[in-house]
Amino acid sequence: MTDQAESSDSKNAKKDFSTAILERKKAANRLVVDEAVNDDNSVVALHPATMEKLQLFRGDTILIKGKKRKDTVVIALADETCDEPKIRMNKVVRSNLRVRLGDVVSVHQCPDVKYGKRVHILPIDDTIEGLTGDLFDAFLKPYFLEAYRPLRKGDNFLVRGGMRSVEFKVIETDPGEYCVVAPDTEIFCEGEPVKREDEERLDEVGYDDVGGVRKQMAQIRELVELPLRHPQLFKSIGVKPPKGILLYGPPGSGKTLIARAVANETGAFFFCINGPEIMSKLAGESESNLRKAFEEAEKNAPSIIFIDEIDSIAPKREKTHGEVERRIVSQLLTLMDGLKSRAHVIVMGATNRPNSIDPALRRFGRFDREIDIGVPDEVGRLEVLGIHTKNMKLAEEVDLERISKDTHGYVGADLAALCTEAALQCIREKMDVLDLEDDTIDAEVLNSMAVTNEHFQTALGTSNPSALRETVVEVPNVSWEDIGGLENVKRELQETVQYPVEPPEKFEKFGMSPSKGVLFYGPPGCGKTLLAKAIANECQANFISVKGPELLTMWFGESEANVREIFDKARQSAPCVLFFDELDSIATQRGSSSGDAGGAADRVLNQLLTEMDGMNAKKTVFIIGATNRPDIIDPALLRPGRLDQLIYIPLPDEDSRHQIFKACLRKSPLSKDIDLRALAKHTQGFSGADVTEICQRACKYAIRENIEKDIEREKRRQENPDSMDEDVDEVPEIKPAHFEESMKYARRSVSDADIRKYQAFAQTLQQSRGFGTEFRFADTSGGATAAADPFATSNAAADDDDLYS
């Protein structure tokens, strides 16, 4: 909410008023909270000029209003060293006002504070453990003696004395809310100490605890706070204030939290209806429950009614078969906008399925405003992380910005889970010094605990966004090193997938949207799926793997819905890589499949086409397809804009085979005299999978030999127990003999005829797309550049021209 951000937005003359309500208003009595110099619970320090502006004198009692409608009374003192618009207060006052350093509080004069007759003060239980003796003499008497301290009912204050500090809470004051403790005030401190849990629970959420929904928050505050606080605004213009807000968004994005924050901050009466709770078995009972809720809210106006999970009580009437549901929907409709107007009652609904709500509810006058609480972007995630980690003990080097970059598609709840997981990880590391049986844990162990970057990284590895829970996404642990050869393919892939995710601003600079799809084709066993796995691992995007045949189901129209759902999930957790393995099973040419399940395959393909390049806005969703029958794939899929990069993954040449041997045997113990080069030379025409198989087989022989040796040695030891074990086996390793043995069984999985087919296909693609090989801009010198083009087939281009003449 800084002013710089606002000014940078308004460069282009027109100011964006959508978040105007969130800006801080400038006023003389709004002061910025600063750390106190001398620690006193009843004193705040102001600059003399500020005091003059507010017409305060030294020693005046003032009323300070903080967040969540908290206020307190203190004595104002002048302090030359305090900056101009700041106010210095210590931690106790800050916690009573629920503010942190740098927040804004408002200061008001409070001339009519009476001397108190009686005050009732109780200690908080965990601060007096193990204390004996009279609390009053030790703590309260020296604190209040001759001090004339103002007190506010409900405040806490901390008293230091005798090596201890005890926290007290003001339970009652007489007279009224505020009073000054004078020498003749009676102080009661009898009674059960206040429990810390009851104390903490009151401290509920405010606007500060909701992150990543700044624009939506502004809309909600316009609709809720303005009518509740200043109804005359709407009266003077002559419109009725809006009555209903529907919040929708994926689970865990903070819909209920926002409603709670609004209730706490506005001070309105808050009535929460959980959808299923109002149902009852008696006829007419459920409707009367609803009516009672609305009556209750009108009695306590201004008030907010919050209906959580509204889709459970207001489903579409034509779809539901129960009589009760229909009656409840009708009752809700009449209550929200019936003949009786409802005054000062705002209805908020929350759901994650806005389309299953009865459409009559979604018109103006009932739920006027539908606010989409979506998945937060990077800035929003940083805000949310800041909120969740503000009470955590973080190590210095924790880089929240980095984490917010790595958590694409996480909603608020996922980020909270991430923080908890990181903290748990920190505790697990300290498990060796903790003992569960002990009653207490050493203070130094507790103090040494801090959550570091590594903990967050481990937590990131185990967590995934909740939008992807059911299509569970295992990021495979395959890296580029596991793939032998294919250097230019790797580069092409990195450009396609990693550039738009890592430096997206480059694409904006050049004014192009990045390409969205890649199709690998080539003989089986050349590493198409492996490449996709590596891409998922290397780039920071989420990864959904879709097996082609899984999408088809027996129900009519279900297969298309599956495709749609997958794309929706991918969009929610963008940037995301969708990998379709065996693409030819669902993308065969249309019209070729006659009569299978009413042409289900064709319909799935049509759905795929519209999803990939339809009219809906694109998020960063990449599509990688892999197939070994590229000739039967529908040509509409292969046009630029859908799968525009067609990458032929050939059988590996000698260098690549050498790389594959190396990659396979990275972790195996090899004997010195194995020559991988020679192996690579001999395996002409083998695919990557065949090469891997050779390695596995050699490995198997080595293991067999090793086990036989062990058995042999065991036998000898039993026959001759006295002999020393002088013949310790050399390190077990794979020897050339094993490879020679395994080469006897090696076989090629791809025949020459197949390869010719693939090459012919690649060739036709090259020609069909290669019209522009001869193209040069007019002014470049011709000869030098023409030679540089590898595909310069001038005669082929000339032949092609005959087709069009």
UniProtKB/Swiss-Prot annotation:
List residues binding ATP.
249-256, 522-529
Respond yes or no to whether keyword Nucleotide-binding is given for this record: yes
Q: Name one GO molecular function term.
A: ATP hydrolysis activity
Its biological purpose is as follows: Probably functions in cell division and growth processes.
NCBIfam families xrefs: CDC48
Question: One Pfam family from the UniProt entry?
Answer: CDC48_N
Name of the protein: Cell division cycle protein 48 homolog
Region (Disordered) location: 783-805
Which InterPro entries has this protein been placed in?
Answer: AAA+_ATPase, AAA_ATPase_CDC48, AAA_ATPase_domain, AAA_lid_3, Asp_de-COase-like_dom_sf, ATPase_AAA_core, ATPase_AAA_CS, Cdc48_dom2
The UniProt entry's sequence similarity note says: Belongs to the AAA ATPase family.
Residue ranges crossing the lipid bilayer per the database entry:
none
For this UniProt record, the keywords arranged alphabetically read as follows: ATP-binding, Cell cycle, Nucleotide-binding, Repeat
Q: In which domain of life is the source organism classified?
A: Eukaryota
Gene name for this UniProt entry: CAFP
